[in-house]
């Protein structure tokens, strides 16, 4: 895109994660399993479920890698992301499609002192990262990307982008969630049509009171649906997952889940009740209205 101004677009494979074609990017931490199969068939065994090659996850949430595409096509700014510190600081390898496993979070309860990585996406010439005020160094940005080794320490991560003359251009932060933990549920539709074919996608997350998602550790969330609607699906964006999507409980992935509610063919209200051990239950009500007839 930088070298050829006549380019007007880019084909991304894939934009969004999908079921099947398991582990197309061949993500692995360490060596491939040793067996008689071709290399491209190893490391994809059950319970691998998703292709895990998109820049939007299965629930429709953009992943940090999407910022690199934005910058390549003329965008400006700075974003940062961190690896969940449960891999002993190992950087995964990929055959294609992906290049990092970091997420836009700095909330990893129980991981104090464990090694991690912090990624910076920016069109600045150089980037510097601070963890609770301590600099991790300053490095040139190559192809809109810079990577910093770190040890997890609850608090705040600050990334600063500089131009070629050393002047500050951007800054951005990630903060650790506070101690109080709640369930949140946000439907993309706040009313449905009573035709049996209308859906509301409810984004569910474990957060603090300020809305910062608690991405680790994971929790099992239970769901109950009654009234003028049914549960069409309930699951996470976890690419390695043996849990079903048609059950009334599921484990979060990076603190998130999604429930899909189908309207009934009769008007009324559909009630969605969510619960998890140690957390206050949450109930949301979605009106289901008769379709307007012209």
What residues fall within each predicted segment?
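Short, conserved beta-strand segments of beta-strand-rich sandwich/propeller modules, principally
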Residues: 154-158, 201, 269-271
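Solvent-exposed beta-strand/loop surfaces of large extracellular or lumenal domains
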Residues: 133-143, 231-250
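Substrate-binding clefts and catalytic carboxylate motifs of secreted carbohydrate-active enzymes
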Residues: 1-197, 209-213
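Short, hydrophobic beta-strand segments
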Residues: 147-152, 246-265
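Short beta-strand elements
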Residues: 170-179, 279-294
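Short aromatic-acidic-glycine turn motif
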Residues: 180-184, 223-240, 292-294
């Amino acid at each position: 895109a930088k070298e050829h101004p006549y380019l007007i677009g880019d084909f991304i494979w894939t934009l969004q994660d999908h079921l099947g074609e398991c582990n197309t990017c061949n993500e692995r931490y360490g060596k491939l399993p040793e067996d008689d199969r071709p290399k491209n068939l190893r490391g994809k065994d059950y319970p691998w479920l998703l292709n895990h090659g998109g820049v939007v996850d299965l629930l429709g949430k953009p992943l940090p890698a999407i910022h690199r595409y934005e910058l390549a096509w003329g965008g400006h700014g700075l974003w940062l992301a961190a690896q969940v510190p449960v891999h002993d600081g190992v950087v995964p390898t990929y055959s294609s499609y992906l290049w990092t496993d970091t997420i836009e979070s700095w909330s990893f309860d129980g991981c104090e002192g464990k090694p991690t990585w912090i990624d910076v996406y920016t069109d600045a010439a150089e980037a510097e990262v601070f963890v609770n005020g301590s600099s991790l160094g300053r490095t040139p940005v190559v192809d809109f990307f810079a990577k910093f080794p770190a040890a997890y320490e609850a608090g705040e991560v600050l990334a600063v982008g500089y131009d070629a003359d050393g002047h500050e251009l951007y800054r951005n932060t990630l903060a650790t969630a506070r101690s109080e933990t709640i369930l949140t549920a946000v439907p993309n539709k706040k009313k449905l049509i009573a035709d049996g074919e209308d859906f509301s996608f409810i984004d569910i997350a474990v957060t603090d009171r300020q809305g910062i998602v608690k991405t680790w550790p994971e929790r099992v969330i239970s769901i109950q649906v009654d009234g003028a609607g049914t549960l069409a699906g309930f699951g996470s964006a976890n690419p390695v997952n043996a849990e079903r999507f048609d059950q009334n409980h599921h484990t979060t992935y990076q603190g998130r889940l999604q429930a899909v509610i189908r309207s009934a063919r009769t008007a009324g209200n559909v009630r969605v009740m969510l619960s998890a051990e140690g957390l206050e239950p949450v109930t949301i009500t979605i009106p289901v209205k008769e379709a307007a007839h012209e």
